[in-house]
Design a protein with these regions (language model features):
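N-terminal helical capping/dimerization or prosegment-like subdomains
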Residues: 2-96, 320, 324
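Active-site metal-coordination/substrate-binding segment of hydrolases
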Residues: 80-148, 437
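A common structural junction motif
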Residues: 89-90, 234-239, 343-352
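Acidic, glycine-rich active-site loops and adjacent beta-strand->loop/helix elements
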Residues: 89-91, 112, 147-156, 178-182, ...
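Acidic/histidine-rich catalytic neighborhood of metal-dependent amide-processing enzymes
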Residues: 121-193, 454
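An extended, acidic, His-containing surface patch that forms the Zn2+-binding/catalytic region
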Residues: 156, 184-185, 243-320, 331-341, ...
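Flexible glycine/proline-rich, aromatic-decorated loop/lid segments
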Residues: 191-205, 412
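A short core secondary-structure module
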Residues: 217-239
Length: 455
């Protein structure tokens, strides 16, 4: 039996185990941003150790001052290359009314694995682990390490503290991150850049309580209207142009070569709109859409709270309100600098508005050339029959920049999720096709690294 036949057989034989472990992981509501889920976060860490140990790896919980990091893997020898695979096991909240099932009640519907965290990022984490187990069974000359974070969804505030414990989390020769989304089913995508992120809340209180609008309206200040006025002054809702003075000063536009690469990726505007349920978007030009979602900064409004939200209309002037916003940044922009510009501008617009930061992540830009990239190309083709497209990722992963600063090693991406899987959305799912292809791709990637040797 050839190695390829052995791998195919291995994947089929391991399917039930994969599904069982994914179900157990999904059913733990590991919502890092919810303080009431602290005990569930600890349960998630304990299960992660159990999963790694059950696969024959050594594993440990690394305390950080916040939620821990789980580290584990296999060591063949210091003379061999070491690769670290990064995933996260914390998830987004799941309170949307559109859910068709209990979000943390795992469902396996013929190879479609439904539940919060199935694709972001528990399914891909397990697929990589199963690929690694096959590589170890082949006795490849390679050290494979896993790093599973529990604070990615809140900006990785304590991840650096975990990396600082070098005896427990050794420095690798390279890193692979499996926490990204393809352009479309059938077209693997390898990002070489990530946008940064600033989250903030803008609060304004103009009274101690809500007041009757018929009695006080016209004289009373309306905090929701004033917050909307601030929002309108920050971003053009029709074009998306950010109006904060100095916001674009450090932005470096993508090169013509990058834009050509974006267009070669197979990106289709129609498919993009269908995948995310959009009726219309700001432009239908493929080059401009890809530039906007992968290589341009943004200002987004996520919510406005205050006043009355029940049925009908309650005629009150709210006593206070809160606006939730974020800004995505591109390489060369600095979150601290942009936040200072934003805070100064808001103070000028309305000095009574308080700006409360909710985390900052730096942008990242790597390379789409070199020997490690070639390994990813061959691995993706082996797993999915097609080489990956090289794009930038519009989202943010705080741990990536932290690893780059701490280790100064190549960081590659081998994501397994699809747009329709529903990252951060109701009715999230993962599927066996992506899981099995991922196992195959990772097994090939480890073989490629072993062949390349220590560099």
């Amino acid at each position: 039996m050839t190695i390829q036949q052995q791998l195919d057989t291995y994947i089929v034989e391991r399917r039930a185990q994969f599904e069982d472990l994914l179900g157990r992981m999904v059913e733990i509501p590991s919502i890092s941003m919810d303080p009431s889920k602290a005990s569930d976060m600890r349960r998630m860490a304990d299960l992660a150790v159990e999963v790694l140990t059950g696969m024959g790896a050594e594993s440990r919980i690394v305390e950080t001052g916040g939620y821990p990091v789980v580290s584990g893997g296999w060591t063949a020898g210091v003379q061999y290359p070491t690769v670290t695979i990064y995933n996260h096991l914390d998830v987004q909240p799941a309170q949307e009314p559109e859910w068709k099932q209990e979000p943390f009640a795992f469902k396996n519907e013929g190879g479609m694995y439904r539940g919060r965290g199935a694709t972001d990022d528990k399914g891909p984490a397990l697929a990589a682990l199963f690929g690694a187990r096959f590589a170890i069974e082949q006795e490849l000359p390679i050290n494979i390490r896993f790093l599973w974070e529990l604070e990615e969804e809140i900006g990785s505030p304590h991840f650096a503290a975990g990396l600082a414990k070098r005896a427990k989390i050794p420095r690798p020769d390279s890193v692979v991150v499996s926490d990204t989304i393809w352009i479309a089913k059938g077209q693997p995508a390898m990002p070489y850049g990530l946008r940064g992120l600033i989250g903030a809340r803008l609060t304004l209180r103009t009274g101690s309580k809500d007041a009757h609008s018929g009695v006080t309206g016209g004289a009373a200040r309306n905090p929701l209207a004033e917050l909307m006025d601030v929002a309108q002054a920050c971003v053009n809702a029709k074009t998306g142009e950010v109006k904060i003075p100095g916001f674009y000063k450090d932005v470096v536009q993508p090169t013509k070569e990058e834009i050509r690469s974006f267009l070669k990726s197979g990106f289709q505007v129609k498919r993009f709109k269908q995948a995310y349920g959009f009726h219309s978007i700001r432009t239908d030009d493929p080059a401009e859409v890809t530039r906007r979602i992968w290589a341009a900064p943004t200002f987004e409004i996520h919510g406005l709270t205050g006043g009355y939200h029940g049925p009908g209309v309650k005629t009150v002037v709210p006593g206070g309100g809160e606006l939730k916003i974020s800004m995505r940044l591109v390489p060369n922009q600095t979150p601290e600098k942009v936040f200072a510009l934003f805070k100064k501008y808001v103070s000028k617009l309305n000095s009574d508005v308080k700006v409360i930061p909710e985390g900052m992540l730096h942008p990242f830009k790597g390379s789409f050339e070199g020997p490690y990239v070639e390994c990813v190309k061959r691995a993706a083709k082996a797993g999915f029959g097609k080489e990956p497209a090289f794009i930038r990722e519009g989202g943010s992963i705080g741990a990536v920049v932290t690893m780059q600063k701490a280790w100064h090693v190549p960081i590659l991406f081998l994501g397994l999720s699809l747009p329709e899987h529903g990252y951060h959305a109701p009715n999230e799912y993962f599927d066996w096709g992506q899981a099995s292809g991922g196992m195959k791709a990772f097994a090939h990637y480890f073989a490629e690294l072993a062949k390349m040797g220590k560099r």
